[in-house]
């Protein structure tokens, strides 16, 4: 019983030591980008705290349906990471954005294709 209480207190202490930190965002594709070829649009968000976060994948300003998201996970330092992705076939002039909202602030991260 004492070990359980110590473990719980240690977990609470570690959580209280983590400070508010904005996410690092990486936007990329599974394969090299090529217009007209199926691929995966991936947005990986890491190193953030607190864990409340929203990731939205957009094409030409509209939310892309059928996206998939990993389970929220954390590292030993109590900072979190998460990945959202979707299959897509890019066409010239398409605009793809990963919009990340954390602590009430939204920021758009663009997927650059053909550059």
Curated annotation (Swiss-Prot):
Domain Ig-like C1-type: from-to ranges: 23-114
Q: What is its main location?
A: secreted
- Which residues constitute the signal peptide according to the record? 1-18
Q: Which InterPro entries match?
A: Ig-like_dom (IPR007110), Ig-like_dom_sf (IPR036179), Ig-like_fold (IPR013783), Ig/MHC_CS (IPR003006), Ig_C1-set (IPR003597), MHC/Immunoglobulin (IPR050160)
Q: Where in the cell is it found?
A: Secreted
User: Mind listing the UniProt keywords for this protein, alphabetically?
Assistant: Immunity, Immunoglobulin domain, MHC I, Secreted, Signal
Query: Single Gene Ontology BP term?
Result: antigen processing and presentation of peptide antigen via MHC class I
User: Mind telling me which residue stretches traverse the membrane in this protein?
Assistant: none
Q: Name one GO cellular component term.
A: MHC class I protein complex
For this protein, the record's SUPFAM superfamilies field holds: Immunoglobulin (SSF48726)
Highest taxon in the source lineage: Eukaryota
Assembly and partners are described as: Heterodimer of an alpha chain and a beta chain. Beta-2-microglobulin is the beta-chain of major histocompatibility complex class I molecules.
- What is the protein's known function? Component of the class I major histocompatibility complex (MHC). Involved in the presentation of peptide antigens to the immune system.
Give the family this protein belongs to, as stated in its UniProt record. Belongs to the beta-2-microglobulin family.
Q: What is this protein called?
A: Beta-2-microglobulin
- Its encoding gene is what? b2m
């Amino acid at each position: 019983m004492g070990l359980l209480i110590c473990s719980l207190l240690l977990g609470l202490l570690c959580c209280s030591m983590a400070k508010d930190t904005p996410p690092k965002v990486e936007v990329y594709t599974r394969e090299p980008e090529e217009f007209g070829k199926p691929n995966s649009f991936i947005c990986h968000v890491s190193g953030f705290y607190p864990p409340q976060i929203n990731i939205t994948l957009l094409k030409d300003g509209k939310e892309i349906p059928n996206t998939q998201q990993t389970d929220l996970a954390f590292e030993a330092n109590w900072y979190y990471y998460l990945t959202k992705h979707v299959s897509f076939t890019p066409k010239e002039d398409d605009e793809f954005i990963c919009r990340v909202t954390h602590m009430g602030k939204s920021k758009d991260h663009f997927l650059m294709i053909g550059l």
